Amino acid sequence: IFAGSAGAEEIKLGAAVSTTGKYSTNGAHTTNGYNLAVRRINEMGGVKVGDKTYELSIVYYDDESTPARGAQLAERLISQDGIKLMLGPYSSGLTKAIAPVTEKYGVPMVEANGASRSLFTQGYKYLFAVLSTSEQYLSASIALAAEMAETQGKEPSSVKIAMAFENDSFSQDVRAGVVADAEALGMKIVVDDQLPPELNDMSATLTKVKALKPDVLVVSGHAKGAATAVRQIAEMKVNVPMIAMTHCDSAQIIEKFGKDANY
């Protein structure tokens, strides 16, 4: 939508983002980021297109953390609200649901929160990302584990890894990246678990970790999975030389768990 305003003309962007449901915390971070960007761009004079200058605004709807709802709202934004430029939702699953809609209408979508590699193997022409894909998220952690082994006079192949991942496209892509990196270095994966759908208990995995004593524990389950992991690692007194985890910031583990966040 290109509309007139009191100052400059306006470009309206559309976004279906989670304000309720399991991604509500991450959705809040997403909208905060989008709003900050729009505010700063407008403060600096807006966006110049040709010989005209436009201010930006965003039309939001709550996708309720549900892919089907996200797809419905993308249809609404484009076909009813007349949106010509979209911003992505939070999560790979929601992005995967919305991308076919924006593709169908030829509406560009810039997304910063759908990192699953599978999003970028579909041949989409109107999907643009500004982040690393998920299989790269923990590559540096596995490389660090190899370096730590070498500083202790050990081979990287001596490193044992325990893993627990949510069963969603993002987390499974993170898992695939960890597995590939570990295999390339000859590391042994001693635990390869799937987190429960509710993401509220990983004690079964942590019991195995205590028994097998791996060198590295890797966890990816979005904000709720990170919070559960930090809480139960402390409760069960699980001692692992190195822990690599996604979504610690969005889970607010320092604020919520204090010293247990550094257990």
Task: Give each language-model segment a name.
Residues 83-191, 241-263:
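Extracytoplasmic ligand/sensor domains, especially the bilobed periplasmic-binding protein
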Residues 25-30, 47-121, 130-133, 195-202, ...:
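Beta-alpha junction/loop-to-helix N-cap segments that form part of ligand/metal-binding clefts
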Residues 8-14, 108-112, 220:
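Short coil-to-beta-strand
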Residues 42, 78, 99-103, 146, ...:
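Surface-exposed amphipathic alpha-helices with a cationic face
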Residues 32-58, 150-154, 183-187:
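Signal peptide-proximal N-terminal region
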